[in-house]
């Protein structure tokens, strides 16, 4: 079959043309993109058949999946002969699917027009029709509604996510494998999700190397960064101190080599991508019903913690060669002992070898859309799927995370310990539940960016290690992307009942049962690509707004927050819709985003520092108020049944003469029924079949906010949220200064008020500056743990 021109789908599909010609792409890839002409020259007034459209999408998805699977660090050309043959066969299979559907099944030869290989018509004219240019510029499929807003299609088909090499001094550096996990912890990797204790309480026997139990206090001391080179090569140390993206010369070189516009690190990107997840998923809830979390915690309606919804703040900086860097805004954060401890614990838990003692490569560089994103390599295991690389996280217990300043004021000591697997407090389960609500989304995004298999978590209380857990990425996807609302649930049950009635229980289980986990993984991957493409468009629009206002800038602060906006339908009904608000403030060249220092600082001094920080940001905003820009982002979802899921069963065909006409018509109507038609386009996207995910497309609308006072209000709103969060991290909430008698009286009065239904929530904490109820509980459990530890040590001395 000959080649066809490269106009990629019809304008009706709103997919940007894809230029093929790179030598890195195989014959099969170039061929399948040329077949995209199938819909370009459709006769006027004729709609593209849905089945043809969906099968073309399906074939392209197959190519994407095959390409992504085979385009990691190693080049296709460097693979062994058997690997290349398998790759070629898979590509041929995708092409043959497309040929069959277009040429044989649908008889749509008239939609195809043969052209020479590599021919890209500049412009084509049809009698009585508009003339369209062969190529379009950013962004794809813009539709302008007025001077302040436009809509475009988020283009997933063109996005490639692959690991790239770093060429240093003209020599291509091969990615060196990170170290293996040590201390006998390898078996944790092969028992995913299991919460595994370091030591058994009953027998006092260790399940892993006892050497990992006690944490060296030296790990709490931050090492000097003055002798560290400003690149990510990490020469001369087993693990490099974190280099912010805008200071990383190696990262800049990779972006220049691969002609990318933006550079960042996975940790700097996750806060933004989290906000985009809330936008694209319409605040999808977490699903822990089928997880290892017991009924000690609420199974339904599990949402993220309050801190997970905090606004994202990043700094966009202009670099050389038209490249921009994206860094987290550290000015609204603090130096935290857990970050320093985590860095050295991650190094401690891995094996030491001569090969890894002086690493020349400590990162994966991921090419995604217009980004090069750097991911730290923590550990590797050859038996894990994919790259075999996984992230290593150390997780402090709840008593530390919810009351960090109190623990720091106590010389980084807490008696709170983990002594069981399950339970509301002092358990691994409690820590896993808190991780799911506050950090799981961030962990999953970091793993996906770096093409890692999963996350290894070590639970500790700064002084001691208590347990371990391995979380594969597909399990994280299931928790984050598999929940659905009651309306979809009722539709799914109705559809399943009908499908069981048509095919029978056995065939339903074997062939038609919904694969929840596969759907969640496909949704996660597609949403991630959409998020990266959307963020690229957001950054370009910020630059465009700043440039159009004649603002000279080298760096700017961007604050993003997805919120719920109440809207009214044409029928008069009110409904909620997610909207992403974006505010960008140009910064002076001398601006530095330094973290707040809290060591050896009193509450009074910290309070003054926070007030100064608020005042500084006020002055900064007033100074650049005229240059302040912003806009809001809305999205609408479009998807439908994939044709592979709507085929009539053989027994319902007329030629088989099994059913009467009425029964055949009933089955035909049921198979053709559009189960998606009543689902609003702004609702959380859910899918009945895994193949339907490939039809998911999103329209995004940018609406400029020209009112400076609205922008000012949004800026201070998000600033105050960040400052309040910072205050809760650094200000120690002291126990109320009252006598035992007064404490008893207050407690009894509060109990009486609750019983008389007169509780107005005032008893959540003893005073405005006292500990919260949860902090009070955790401090009590810490005292209980300290007493238990003393009794155990005394008992051990007695037996000796």
From Swiss-Prot:
GO BP annotations listed: mitochondrial RNA 5'-end processing; mitochondrial RNA metabolic process
Major subcellular location class: mitochondrion
Biased composition, class Basic and acidic residues, residue ranges: 219-229
Superkingdom of the source species: Eukaryota
UniProt keywords, alphabetically: Mitochondrion
GO cellular component terms, semicolon-separated: mitochondrial envelope; mitochondrion
Annotated compartments: Mitochondrion
PANTHER family found in the cross-reference section: MITOCHONDRIAL TRANSLATION SYSTEM COMPONENT PET127-RELATED
Function description: Could be a component of the mitochondrial translation system with a role in promoting accuracy of translational initiation.
Family from the record: Belongs to the PET127 family.
Note: Present with 1730 molecules/cell in log phase SD medium.
Protein name, per record: Putative mitochondrial translation system component PET127
Species, as recorded: Saccharomyces cerevisiae (strain ATCC 204508 / S288c) (Baker's yeast)
Gene that encodes it: PET127
């Amino acid at each position: 079959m000959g080649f066809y021109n490269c106009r990629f789908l019809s304008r009706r599909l709103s997919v940007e043309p894809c230029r093929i010609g790179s030598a890195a792409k195989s014959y099969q890839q170039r061929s399948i993109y040329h077949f995209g002409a199938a819909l370009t020259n459709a006769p006027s007034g004729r709609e593209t058949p849905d089945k043809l459209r969906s099968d073309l999408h399906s074939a392209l998805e197959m190519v994407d999946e095959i390409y992504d699977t085979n385009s990691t660090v190693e080049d296709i050309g460097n693979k062994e002969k058997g690997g290349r043959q398998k790759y070629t066969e898979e590509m041929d299979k995708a092409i043959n699917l497309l040929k069959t559907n277009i040429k044989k099944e649908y008889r749509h030869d008239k939609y195809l027009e043969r052209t020479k290989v590599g021919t890209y018509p500049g412009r084509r004219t049809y009698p009585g029709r508009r003339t369209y240019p062969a190529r379009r510029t950013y962004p794809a499929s813009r539709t302008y509604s007025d001077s302040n807003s436009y809509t475009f299609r988020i283009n997933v088909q063109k996005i490639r996510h692959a690991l790239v090499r770093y060429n240093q001094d003209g020599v291509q550096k091969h990615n060196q494998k990170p170290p293996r996990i040590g201390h006998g912890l390898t078996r944790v990797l092969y028992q995913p999700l299991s919460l595994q204790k370091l030591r058994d309480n009953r027998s006092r026997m260790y399940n892993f190397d006892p050497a990992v139990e006690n944490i060296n206090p030296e790990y709490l001391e931050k090492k000097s960064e003055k002798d560290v080179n400003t690149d990510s090569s990490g020469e001369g140390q087993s693990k490099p101190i974190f280099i912010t993206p805008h200071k990383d010369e190696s990262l800049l070189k990779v972006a220049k080599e691969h002609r990318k516009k933006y550079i960042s690190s996975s940790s700097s990107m996750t806060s933004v991508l989290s906000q985009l997840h809330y936008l694209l998923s319409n605040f999808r809830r977490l699903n822990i019903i089928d997880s290892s979390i017991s009924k000690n915690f609420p199974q339904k309606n599990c949402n993220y913690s309050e801190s997970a919804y905090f606004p994202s703040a990043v700094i966009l900086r202009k670099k050389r060669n038209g490249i921009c860097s994206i860094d987290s805004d550290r000015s609204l954060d603090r130096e935290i002992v857990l970050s320093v401890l985590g860095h050295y614990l991650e190094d401690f838990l891995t094996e030491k070898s001569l090969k890894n003692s002086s690493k020349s490569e400590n990162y994966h560089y991921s090419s995604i859309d217009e980004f090069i994103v750097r991911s730290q390599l923590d550990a590797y295991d050859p038996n894990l799927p994919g790259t075999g690389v996984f992230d290593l996280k150390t997780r402090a217990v709840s008593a530390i995370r919810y009351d960090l300043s109190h623990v720091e004021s106590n010389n980084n000591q807490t008696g709170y310990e983990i002594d069981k697997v399950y339970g509301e407090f002092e358990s691994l389960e409690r820590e896993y539940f808190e991780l799911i609500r506050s950090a799981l989304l961030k962990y999953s995004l970091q793993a996906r960016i770096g093409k890692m298999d999963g996350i290894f978590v070590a639970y500790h209380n700064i002084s001691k290690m208590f347990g371990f857990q391995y979380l594969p990425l597909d399990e994280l996807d299931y928790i984050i992307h598999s929940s659905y609302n009651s309306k979809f649930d009722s539709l799914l049950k109705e559809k399943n009942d009908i499908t069981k009635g048509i095919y029978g229980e056995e065939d339903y289980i074997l062939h038609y049962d919904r694969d929840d986990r596969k759907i969640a993984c496909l949704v996660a991957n597609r949403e991630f690509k959409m998020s990266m493409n959307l963020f690229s468009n957001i950054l370009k629009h910020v630059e465009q707004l700043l440039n159009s206002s004649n603002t000279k800038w080298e760096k700017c602060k961007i604050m993003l927050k997805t919120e719920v906006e109440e809207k009214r339908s044409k029928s008069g009904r009110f409904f909620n819709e997610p909207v992403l608000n974006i505010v960008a403030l140009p910064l002076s060249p001398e601006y530095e985003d330094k973290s707040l220092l809290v060591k050896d600082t009193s509450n009074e001094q910290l309070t003054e520092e926070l007030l100064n920080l608020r005042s500084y940001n006020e002055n900064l905003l007033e100074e650049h108020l005229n240059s302040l820009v912003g806009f809001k982002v809305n999205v609408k979802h479009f998807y439908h049944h994939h044709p592979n899921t709507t085929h009539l069963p053989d027994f319902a065909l007329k030629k088989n003469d099994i059913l009467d006409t009425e029964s055949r018509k009933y089955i035909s109507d049921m198979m053709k029924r559009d189960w998606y038609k009543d689902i609003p386009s702004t609702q959380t996207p859910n899918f009945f079949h895994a193949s339907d995910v490939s039809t998911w497309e999103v329209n995004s609308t940018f609406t400029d906010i020209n009112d400076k006072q609205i922008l000012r209000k949004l800026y201070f709103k998000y600033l105050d949220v960040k400052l309040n969060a910072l205050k809760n991290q650094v200000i120690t909430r002291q126990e109320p200064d009252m006598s035992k008698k007064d404490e008893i009286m207050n407690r009894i009065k509060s109990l009486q008020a609750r019983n008389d239904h007169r509780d107005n929530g005032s008893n959540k904490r003893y005073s405005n500056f006292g500990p919260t109820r949860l902090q009070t509980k955790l401090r009590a459990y810490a005292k209980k743990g300290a007493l238990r530890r003393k009794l155990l040590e005394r008992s051990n001395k007695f037996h000796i």
